[in-house]
Regions:
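A short, Lys/Arg-rich alpha-helix, primarily the initiator
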Residues: 1-19
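Residues within the helices of the helix-turn-helix
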Residues: 14, 25, 53, 95
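Conserved binding/catalytic microenvironments
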Residues: 121-415
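DNA major-groove recognition helix of helix-turn-helix/homeodomain DNA-binding modules
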Residues: 49-65
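The alpha-helix within a helix-turn-helix
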Residues: 17, 28, 56
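N-terminal secretory signal peptides and thylakoid transit peptides that target proteins
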Residues: 77-104
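Short alpha-helical DNA-recognition segment
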Residues: 20-40
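Short C-terminal boundary/hinge segments that cap the last helix of small helical domains
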Residues: 61-75, 313
Length: 415
């Protein structure tokens, strides 16, 4: 927040530009202006406010941060005051307040990450040799649905990954930086923070391309496609994911890790096609994914970038058929799935929420509640933190308040 508080809007633009790896001429090309104009913007010698706002949007400076730097914030940041009357403690009464907030993690953590995306923080000072372990720990937090903890650790992880890449300029360190942004994008997408997720996915893709690693590029592209789907850009998502499939296939699929990446990208292609309403493509791709995963182990080795398994493909099939509106087929695809087939809390919870969506699509509130309760008991964050799942809980309470378990679900989402 230092640049914002000191009214250095141009510095925010510069930091955001450099974080994307752009030169002033690169930003100028996107703004349809000259390099010298960009230079004046960054030095604070231009009064072109619309151009400044356009530049800020391109390089990912959050709007509130830019407004503060321009002195346009007329009031301090809002604070939350909790009225602790007995009625307020009833989760049913608290629910509208939670829904209005639309953010199930501490706002301070999200603001801190947004600031880190606008201006990369100073490195933490942790030894460079620990970065791989910290990336693994971050993936572990995501897998454990520990969303707040991961939000807390991401700013320093991104800062140190940036430092490593800038010091060595090695392909491996750019791949590590891409991985850090990929993890950030995964989390932000799950939390429904799609603008920030798009920014981090773009950066993950950029640094993966610099690294030359087809697997890092596939991971980044998968997240980019996911956020594009949420933004209603299904055609762009499909184009990105199909290009990534081709790049992975071009490796020759000589290793199990490459074969797993290929199966994962086919699953992502199938789901993207289903969201776009391309039934034929979706069904062909999910069948291809099942074939590609046929020889993969039932339990992926620890640390694998794409820990896809035959059961995981079946879970994707549930999502594909749900997206196509075929709830019965989705439930049939998931008939033999059980939580023990999935190694992480996040995946166990996701299995139950995906089945819940299918039951809800089939207008079966009792079964929907049962699956959501199973998810909440394993991974509360999968129910509490995901906007789409919270919406199902809201709808259950509005339409079926007397179904057994609804009050328990509301209490989980209001926690």
């Amino acid at each position: 927040m230092e640049f914002a508080e000191r009214r250095h809007a141009g510095c925010l633009i510069r930091v955001g530009r450099e974080a994307r790896g752009w030169r002033q001429s690169d930003l100028g090309m996107r703004l349809a202006c000259s390099q010298s104009t960009v230079s004046r913007l960054e030095q604070g010698r231009s009064l072109d406010l619309p151009l400044l706002k356009q530049a800020a949007d391109l390089v990912g400076v959050p709007g509130p941060l830019l407004n503060t730097s321009l002195g346009l914030s007329s009031s301090p940041a809002p604070t939350v005051v909790v009225d602790r009357t007995p009625a307020q403690e009833d989760p049913m009464r608290r629910r509208p307040l939670i829904t209005a907030a639309a953010l199930a993690v501490p706002l301070s953590l999200m603001t801190r990450l947004e600031s880190a995306l606008a201006a990369t923080p100073e490195p933490s000072g942790a030894p460079a040799r620990t970065l791989d372990a910290r990336l693994a720990a971050a993936r572990g937090q995501f897998d454990a649905a520990a969303h707040a903890g991961l939000l807390r650790s991401l700013p320093s992880l991104l800062a140190d990954a940036h430092q490593g890449a800038s010091e060595t300029r090695r392909d491996l360190d750019y791949a590590r930086l891409s991985s850090a942004y990929t993890i950030a994008s995964q989390l932000l997408n799950k939390l429904g923070q799609y603008k920030q997720s798009r920014l981090t996915a773009d950066r993950a893709t950029l640094y993966a391309d610099v690294s030359g690693s087809p697997l890092a590029a596939a991971a980044a592209t998968r997240e980019l496609a996911a956020v594009l789907r949420h933004q209603g850009q299904e055609a762009a998502a499909q184009a990105h994911i199909e290009a990534a499939v081709a790049r992975v296939e071009a490796t020759g699929l000589a290793t199990e890790a490459q074969a797993a990446a290929f199966a994962q990208m086919l699953c992502s292609t199938a789901y993207t096609a289903a969201i776009a309403g391309d039934r034929d493509q979706a069904l062909v791709m999910i069948r291809e994914a099942a074939r590609a995963a046929r020889d993969l182990p039932d339990a992926a080795p620890a640390g694998r970038l794409f820990p896809i398994t035959p059961a995981a493909v079946d879970l994707y099939a549930v999502g594909v058929h749900w997206a196509l509106g075929d709830a019965g087929t989705a439930l049939e695809a998931g008939r033999n799935l059980h939580a023990d087939q999935f190694p992480t809390i996040e995946r166990k919870g996701r299995m139950h929420t995906d089945l819940a969506r299918a039951w809800w699509q089939r207008a079966k509130p009792d079964q929907t509640v049962g699956e959501l309760l199973s998810a909440a008991r394993l991974a509360p964050g999968e129910v509490r933190d995901r906007p789409a799942i919270r919406q199902i809980v809201d709808d259950l309470y509005a339409k079926h308040p007397h179904v057994s378990g609804v009050r328990e679900l509301v209490a989980v989402t209001a926690a």
